[in-house]
């Protein structure tokens, strides 16, 4: 079962591995919070050997993540306070039924810290950026400006030049 947390919606996809083709076949898909939950979901969710994955798209806010995992019936515990923006890594996380919401958020935060530390260590020299947090903010702005990876370098150079000019 895959929970997809996107910018505009949270969807749930129930899939089963076809041993013949070694591909996943979709059994059901629905939006989280839907009035009617497909029987395929509840039947699959309650099996012992089910794998659960939470996939978070880039651009999703911390509030959206907390709100989504708070509505997942496979998770337990309180999520706690909404973490600061930019502190949760967009990625795919495998979870187990009964996992703690706050522990999942801590995993997401640790993953983001690791990513940010690696980006900070490998940054170009002579950038007018003083902290990893400034690097994250600039990267977020660049990502908002263009989703095209080939354009990021040029957009980044425009921002760096503006910062250098003061």
Q: How should each PLM-predicted stretch be described?
A:
Residues 1-166:
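Conserved catalytic or metal-liganding residues and their short signature motifs at active sites
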């Amino acid at each position: 079962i895959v929970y997809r947390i996107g910018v505009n919606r949270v969807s749930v996809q129930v899939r089963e591995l076809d041993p013949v083709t070694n591909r996943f076949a979709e059994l059901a898909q629905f939006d989280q919070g839907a009035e009617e939950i497909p029987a395929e979901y509840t039947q699959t969710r309650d099996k012992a050997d089910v794998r659960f994955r939470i996939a978070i798209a880039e651009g999703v806010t911390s509030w959206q993540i907390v709100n989504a995992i708070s509505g997942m019936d496979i998770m337990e515990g309180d999520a706690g306070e909404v973490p600061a923006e930019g502190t949760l890594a967009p990625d795919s996380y495998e979870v187990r039924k009964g996992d703690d919401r706050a522990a999942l958020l801590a995993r997401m935060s640790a993953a983001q810290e690791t990513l940010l530390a690696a980006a900070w260590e490998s940054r170009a020299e002579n950038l007018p950026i003083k902290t990893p947090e400034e690097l994250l903010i600039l990267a977020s702005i660049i990502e908002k400006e263009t989703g095209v990876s080939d354009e990021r370098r040029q957009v980044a150079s425009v921002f760096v030049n503006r910062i250098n000019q003061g």
